[in-house]
Design a protein with these regions (language model features):
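Loop/turn-rich, solvent-exposed surfaces of beta-rich toroidal or solenoidal domains
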Residues: 265-283, 307-421, 426
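Short loop/turn segments immediately following beta-strands, especially the blade-tip
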Residues: 49-58, 109-120, 173-174, 233-239, ...
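Beta-propeller domains
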Residues: 2-11, 19-127, 160-163, 171-174, 183-345
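Structural signature of eukaryotic scaffold interfaces centered on beta-propeller domains
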Residues: 2-26, 74-93, 135-147, 194-200, ...
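Surface-exposed loop and turn segments in beta-propeller and other repeat-based domains
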Residues: 61-80, 122-135, 180-188, 241-251, ...
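Short, conserved, GDST-rich strand-edge loop motifs in beta-rich repeat architectures
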Residues: 19, 23-25, 32-42, 88-95, ...
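Asp-box/WD-like beta-propeller blade repeats and closely related beta-sheet repeat scaffolds
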Residues: 112-197
């Protein structure tokens, strides 16, 4: 997103509205968090810079790698020090990418402005400092605030208990300020969060206890209460827990959460991974919040797998900047879907494409229809490569016409469900989007093979453009 510079700068970072952002410049670079943690390769995780300009000679290539100084971090999500929430502040500058490490609890701050094609390490926030001042560990999602502070959801205490989770505040110099939520107002589990200031509300979601999920997924842990099924509704910016929404058995493991981008809207969605439902949340007439299942992905009956039924596992989703389309992935099934959400209560399937998954042709796992027929999905080869793993993180271009896809979820879960990723690494694909009639099609000219990295195959996770995007920027 366009940034003003110099003495004539009259606005802060980003754009005044989501629709202005849609008309922003086409992406030329994308930053990708890449992981060696958990792979058995004793190398530091790194931030990859990928060239996504089709007119460039290095299109679809990694053009720079910034290794972090430690081993075993598990870089995961990323966010900015400033975004469109600071658009009204000319002194604010989108310069630093925040990289929380999910396993080590370190937080890296990366300077992307000195050389956008070759970012450099600016600061390391050490876990001891975070724990000493807040008791928090396992940092996940970061969002910048209009105040200039940075807020990071943390999933537990240093021992991996969910009970210690909450929200970390860093100041504009990346010093630990403390917790955001008021004492006694911590959520039961932590994961993602999104705020909608005009409705004075922040809502956070629930993964599970770090002591459980860091060891891999065990269905028994769900029954033992080690995974979440709640949304936590907070007053914004005060940090008071006002309401807890129990999503019940239809909302097990609610992960990514997004409001509609239009800041006047009082509705959004959360992707519930295990039950594979997109749940819509909304404000009611009395000012409280409620929820309903908006999209349901039925589990597939399968043969030759660990269970007789396979959930889709919705692990990521996003909403186009004009709030017309919602996109989500089914990490285990292997498809990416596009829904028209112009009527948010009634999403309509507009596009679907298979780009991996456990039931693709050539896999030992087969799906079984109700009448007993078996089938497997057709997955295209791209530049001679058969897609590995399943679609996991996604990022959409500002104009809504290109969707980028990586395939690593979390190293221990990758090893459990897609062991070939450990041996062959991740990749990144690009899907062309029809925004008029709907439809998704794999771009045959784009394939980034993180299996061919100089230090060995790595796992690619979240993607960010230098100028912000539909999953980093919040309008006030």
């Amino acid at each position: 997103m366009a940034e003003g510079n110099g003495c004539c700068k009259t606005t802060g970072p980003g754009y005044g509205t989501p629709l202005e952002a849609m008309a922003g410049p086409k992406e030329a670079l994308i930053y990708v968090t890449c992981v060696y943690s958990g792979t058995g390769r004793e190398k530091p995780d790194f931030l990859a810079t990928v060239d996504v300009d089709p007119n460039s000679p290095t299109y679809s290539k990694v053009i720079h790698r910034l290794p972090v100084p430690y081993i075993g971090d598990e870089l995961h999500h990323s966010g900015w020090n400033a975004c469109s929430s600071c658009h009204g502040d000319p002194s604010a500058n989108r310069r630093f990418l925040i990289l929380p490490s999910l396993v080590s609890s370190r937080i890296y701050v990366v300077d992307t402005q000195m050389n956008p094609k070759a970012p450099s390490l600016h600061k390391v926030v050490q876990p001891e400092d975070i724990v000493k001042k807040t008791g928090l560990a396992y940092p996940h999602t970061s969002h910048c605030l209009a105040s200039g502070d940075i807020m990071v959801s943390c999933l537990g205490d240093k021992d991996g208990n969910a009970k210690g989770n909450g929200f970390l505040l860093l100041d504009s110099e990346f010093n630990v300020k403390g917790r955001w939520e008021k004492p006694g107002h911590s959520p039961s589990f932590g994961y993602d969060f999104w705020y909608q200031p005009r409705h004075k509300t922040m809502i956070s979601s629930s993964w599970g206890a770090p002591a459980a999920f860091t060891k891999g997924f065990n269905l028994q842990h769900v029954g033992e209460g080690l995974y979440g099924r709640h949304l936590h509704v907070y007053s914004w910016p005060d940090g008071e827990l006002k309401q807890t929404l129990d999503l019940g058995d239809t909302g097990l493991i609610p992960l990514e959460i997004r409001f509609l981008h239009d800041p006047s809207k009082d509705t959004g969605y959360v992707g519930c991974a295990l039950t594979s439902n997109m749940v819509r949340f909304f404000k009611t007439e009395d000012g409280s919040w409620n929820h309903e299942v908006a999209i349901s992905v039925k589990p597939l009956k399968v043969q030759n797998w660990i269970l007789p039924e396979m959930p889709g596992l919705i692990t990521d989703f996003l909403i186009s900047l004009d709030d017309r389309f919602l996109y989500f992935v089914n990490w285990l099934h292997g498809d990416v879907r596009q829904y028209n959400i112009e009527d948010p209560k009634n999403p309509i399937l507009a596009g679907q494409v298979w780009v991996g998954g456990l039931i693709q042709k050539g896999s030992p796992v087969v799906a079984v229809t109700d009448d007993g027929h078996t089938w497997q999905s057709d997955v295209p080869e791209i530049q001679g490569h058969r897609p590995r793993g399943g679609p996991q993180m996604i990022q959409l271009s500002l104009d809504g016409k290109r969707l980028y896809v990586t395939n690593s979820l979390f190293s221990t879960w990758d090893r459990q469900f897609y062991p070939e990723l450990m041996e062959k690494g991740s990749h990144m694909l690009q899907i062309d989007v029809d925004t008029e009639k709907g439809g998704l099609k794999v771009n045959p000219n784009f394939f980034v093979d993180f299996g061919a990295e100089p230090d060995g195959p790595s796992l690619a996770h979240e993607m960010r453009y230098p100028g912000g995007d539909c999953t980093s920027d919040i309008w006030v």
